[in-house]
């Protein structure tokens, strides 16, 4: 459903209709689909936030919190910062929004144990957000990968939100790590296998033009 709607929304956001408040119902429904189907469309979500910014009376904090949570699921990319920048200060004082921002601060500063404790205490905040916990684990896995060459299983378990036993071993295997009998995990770290290489990366302006326009 979300995949099918993505095409419709993409057409809807072209030209002056991008900031037509009459499109909000469709866009808000699309946000709900992203949340429930573990889909993601940053451009559409930024358009919703912009419409709220231009039309404060239409703002819905429940939708804003969902957009922010989806942005957190895309860490370490800067989506959360981009979204927060177009949310009015008054709305950021809403209790639910403040909780999401607090969680973001803990994740962005790598206070992962504290973040998981917060998620446990505020479980209702992320209830219904499909794939949230694993998305956060993927981000933490990325941080571990650029920080450690080896890590104790007990610490990895703590950082990954309490994964233990078969769940932890499955995660280790899926990420290409290796676990030894003494409880040490050998992390696949690209920096440990540095090779001289020339990298040429082409950036297609068209692929980011919509996001740049939305962030203005």
Curated annotation (Swiss-Prot):
* Residue span(s) of domain PCI: 40-202
- Which superkingdom does the taxonomy of this entry point to? Eukaryota
Q: Where in the cell is it found?
A: Cytoplasm
Q: Which Pfam families match?
A: CSN8_PSD8_EIF3K
Recorded GO terms, molecular function? Answer: ribosome binding; RNA binding; translation initiation factor activity
Identify the keywords attached in UniProt to this record, alphabetized.
Cytoplasm, Initiation factor, Protein biosynthesis
Q: Which GO terms describe its biological process?
A: formation of cytoplasmic translation initiation complex; regulation of translational initiation
Q: How does it assemble?
A: Component of the eukaryotic translation initiation factor 3 (eIF-3) complex.
Its family remark reads: Belongs to the eIF-3 subunit K family.
Function, as annotated, reads:
Component of the eukaryotic translation initiation factor 3 (eIF-3) complex, which is involved in protein synthesis of a specialized repertoire of mRNAs and, together with other initiation factors, stimulates binding of mRNA and methionyl-tRNAi to the 40S ribosome. The eIF-3 complex specifically targets and initiates translation of a subset of mRNAs involved in cell proliferation.
UniProt-listed HAMAP family: eIF3k
The protein here is known as Eukaryotic translation initiation factor 3 subunit K
Species of origin reads: Nematostella vectensis (Starlet sea anemone)
